[in-house]
Amino acid sequence: MCAPRLGRKLPHCSRTCFRHYDTLAMLKFTCCNQLRQFSEPAQAQVLTGIVRGFERECLRVDHDGLLAKTPHPNALGSKLLHPWITTDYAEALLEFITPPSSDPAFPMAFLKDIHRFSARQLGSEYLWAGSMPCKIGPDADIAIAHYGPSNTARFKEVYREGLGLRYGRAMQTIAGAHYNWSLPEAFWPVMRDCCNGESNLQDFTNRRYFGLIRNFLRFGWLIPYLFGASPALCKSFLQGKPSDLRELSPGTLHGPYATSLRMSDLGYQNHAQDQMAISFNSLQEYTRGLEAAIRTHDPYYADMGVRDGEHWKQLSDCLLQTESEFYAAMRPKRIGLHGERPALALQRYGVQYVEMRLFDLNPFIDIGIAPEQSLFADTLLLMCLFRDSPPITSREQGENDENKLRVVTRGRQPGLQLLVHNREQPLRSLAHELFDDMAPFAAMLDAAYGDQRYATALRDLRQRIGEPDRTPSAQVIEAVKQHGSYFNFAMEMSKSHSQKLQAEALSQETQAQFTASIQTSLHAQAELDAQPKGSFEDFVAGYFA
């Protein structure tokens, strides 16, 4: 059964889709058999194999709340080779990565342990609580991450030099959280068989993952509405550039109804991406678009120059230096061989998992992520997977982009309308409809795990639709007012969280695990640095060959 987007109702399904849920007759799904199959307790158990992981970025700041000028602490290991503690763009921008796990509780628990361990190694520095930085100076004051003398390390550094050259370094100090998600291998044969899908299982898997991604691009605006937590920022972040933001207090600007300035045009965006023909309509179109973008020269970037003698300013003057520069709310991922480009790994082996990139850091929580976020994400992603997902046209992509922009800049505005098939409809109605559509999938997950955690999370989060004051973005605005500025609020949260994390004990086993991993990474870094290296120019050419 083909299905429309939100805002239109289907005729009653003639089959018994999911015998416990008559509401599924209104779902926009492709095959009733899929839902019936996975509603049975025995089949629902396969969903306990869903694999999850978090990546959390956060700035190190000094005791005055300024961007830390110190190098990455040696006590945190090699930022190039440590599996869980690394850096993103800036030397002061930490990134904590949880190993993938099918235990739903593991990512949050492990992320908490990373924070506890790291907070103890920072001395008088703090982990900045918010997504938006504060009190940052000119680009020259923002040091990019330094990874060592090897060609691998230099490649990462030049890439970051290029990002700063193209977009400015201030934008690279914004922090967020990514959610990595995949279905177990045992899930796919069952789904393929009840869908009469392709004989090649990887082709079927790729097609369904890309269908999930397209639906997430349609409905992902619900994430910043429910969880956005960056409605205000320090005036210093704009570095004198004009904006439509209003003054909330001296030194603090905000959008009165904003949910996530991090996801707005002020945040991390790649406007050159508008020139790229990168489509999510199939794996082939997606990888073909990426390949074209890393080989298409851009006059603006060419004018910046790639090299000054031996100094590399960027990896290339193409639309993208590497595939990682492509910005999207969700990306298909595949762990390839060492040195293998992401697009080639996807082409050769197919989609392994998806990376959802829309979570702001919740400044009220010491690890920046609330427990209900993964429960909601599981349910939304499962619904996006099962739901019919036609190709996205350029017109619809414009709608999707506009809806996201409206939600991140004024999502709590009373009466806000979003676009559905060129018609405006109330955000609240569309959000309630999405929650209706997700309810059976929450029940499916609850059947798998034997409790009501998913239904309870959806019920609680649904209240934020009619009561926007319950959203983190609204609560941040109120907290900023109480503290007098965004800086005062974020600094208070940063100090409080760091002190709390330092006071919480790690088990001897966990402490030993981290200590061993630190030493292993430093030893591996020393070995890499000692190896002879060839020409960096040849190294870069080999990567793109």
PLM feature segments, named:
Residues 57, 171-184, 353-360:
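Histidine-centered divalent-metal-coordination microenvironment in nucleic-acid enzymes
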Residues 452-545:
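Extended, compositionally biased alpha-helical segments that mediate assembly or anchoring
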Residues 347-348, 354-442, 446:
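Substrate-recognition/cap regions that form aromatic- and gly/pro-loop-enriched pockets
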